[in-house]
Amino acid sequence: MVVLALHVALYLPGCRSLKDRRRLVRPIVEGARARFRVSAADLGGADRWHRAELGFAVVSGSHAHARDVIDEVERFVWSFPEIEVLETGRTWSEGP
């Protein structure tokens, strides 16, 4: 079993309030959950309306499958024109 986690730091240039931030972040998190069947969460940064950190994770029996799913999730995040991706990072974990 392998777990692959993706961390994404975003800049949200059009946000003027927490409500604006949620309006931009929610479709990304919920869309990734629905389309790719991954765990997805807003990891914080709610005190800074123009920034967001998102986390995504997939559990799989194969490295290749996990990598393919997370590649799709990353492309999905990049497809939102109203955000800027500042940084991404991946973490692998293997279980028994």
Predicted feature residues:
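A structural signal for short, well-ordered beta-strand segments
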Residues: 6-10, 54-56, 88-90
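A general secondary-structure boundary signal
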Residues: 9, 42-46, 67-72
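Residue-level signal for beta-strand positions within conserved beta-sheet cores that form or flank
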Residues: 36, 52, 84
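A short linear hydrophobic-aromatic micro-motif
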Residues: 37-44, 86-87
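Short, charge-patterned binding micro-sites
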Residues: 41-62, 94
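C-terminal structural segments of small proteins and small subunits
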Residues: 60-96
